[in-house]
């Protein structure tokens, strides 16, 4: 692989090998969605840490099976899944409000040249964005709310899908040269995708619900490492705690590991406008997504954020918590969570759960049953 950003990689090792980054006053604990006047940069400000050390590191099927075996040993009741109803993972991911962070997570994933090129060349993101949305959430929600066997089958299915995703970068992007080879099982890209999902979920949650305590945030991050194992990422290679995780994100956002190409810019604009789908994207959602993006990527994606957009995002932050608080549980909680609740009560998923599942995962029940 022809990689031009090796100076960033040589600084690797500290955070991902268990060393803490330097902490300062600007942490996620002090900011997030209800204090976004700094437009996304404060979300991970004043932190510095290394990025993944080895761009040639890959996930093997043997490693994935080791992670699955390790998780399986910790599961007490397989019917409850790998997290269970008392976990903070269920508490956060049951909220439909997490959709508020989906655009942000998607754009930050597109900021990784390997991920963006893989999505462009191997997915239906542009032609069938709803199908892509459903395929992503089918896997993620099954890992979270399915039974343990379902979660493990989802992990193996995802791995098999990733084995077929290879190619070359068509142009120079950030620290990568044209012709550089990518594979979906490369650890740095998988780690970045995982990180965007975890961070964006908390940002979205706190847009409409009370801010998580530092203890809860730490617990959520700790539990998230279990799901990382289902991606094939060894938990002990991840930052050891939430503060270090912030530091890793900060380093990534400032590094040449990330960069936006013309093609990924087009993909991002299509996502934010709902092009190719029957679902219109509200202006307020576009504005809020733009606001909670780090300023570097607002610029690189070519997203305008003038006074009108700022006002739109500000209004959304004011009314969203009030509207969300009035939603009945059937609308507030995602279908996969409702299905899991029914399963634990030894009942079939009800009509509302099935309809909600159709929206979130494109089918009435979680997949990967025997």
Regions found by a protein language model. Name each.
Residues 12, 22-27, 37:
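Short linear motifs in low-complexity or flexible loops
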Residues 8, 31-34:
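Short hydrophobic alpha-helical segments enriched in small aliphatic residues
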Residues 32, 40-370:
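Mature, function-bearing regions of proteins
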């Amino acid at each position: 692989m022809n990689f031009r950003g090796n100076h960033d990689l040589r600084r690797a090792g500290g955070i991902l090998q268990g060393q803490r980054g330097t902490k300062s006053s600007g942490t996620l604990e002090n900011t997030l969605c209800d204090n976004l006047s700094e437009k996304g940069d404060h979300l991970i400000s004043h932190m510095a840490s290394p990025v993944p050390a080895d761009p040639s590191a890959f996930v093997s099927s043997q490693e994935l099976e080791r992670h699955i075996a390790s998780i399986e040993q910790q599961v007490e009741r397989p019917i409850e899944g790998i997290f269970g109803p008392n976990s903070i993972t269920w508490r956060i991911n049951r909220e439909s409000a997490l959709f508020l962070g989906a655009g942000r997570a998607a754009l930050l994933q597109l900021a990784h040249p390997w991920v963006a090129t893989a999505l462009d060349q191997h997915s239906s993101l542009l032609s069938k964005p709803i199908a892509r949305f459903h395929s992503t959430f089918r896997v993620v929600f099954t890992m979270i709310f399915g039974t343990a066997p379902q979660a493990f089958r989802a992990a193996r299915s995802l791995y098999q899908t990733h084995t077929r995703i290879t190619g070359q970068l068509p142009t120079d992007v950030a620290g990568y040269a044209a012709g550089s080879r990518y594979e979906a099982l490369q650890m740095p890209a998988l780690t970045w995708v995982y990180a965007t999902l975890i961070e964006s979920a908390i940002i979205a949650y706190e847009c409409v619900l009370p801010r998580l305590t530092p203890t809860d945030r730490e617990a959520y991050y700790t539990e998230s490492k279990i799901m990382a194992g289902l991606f094939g990422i060894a938990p002990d290679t991840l930052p050891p705690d939430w503060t270090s995780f912030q530091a890793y994100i900060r380093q990534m956002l400032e590094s040449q590991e990330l960069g936006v190409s013309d093609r990924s810019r087009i993909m991002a604009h299509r996502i934010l406008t709902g092009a190719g789908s029957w679902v219109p994207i509200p202006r307020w959602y576009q504005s809020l997504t733009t606001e909670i993006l780090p300023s570097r990527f607002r610029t690189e994606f070519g997203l305008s954020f003038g006074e009108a957009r700022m006002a739109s995002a500000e209004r959304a932050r004011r009314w969203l918590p009030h509207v969300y608080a009035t939603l009945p549980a059937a609308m507030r909680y995602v279908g996969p969570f409702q299905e899991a609740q029914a399963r634990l009560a030894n009942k079939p998923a009800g009509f509302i759960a099935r309809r909600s599942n159709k929206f979130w995962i494109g089918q009435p029940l979680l997949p990967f049953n025997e």
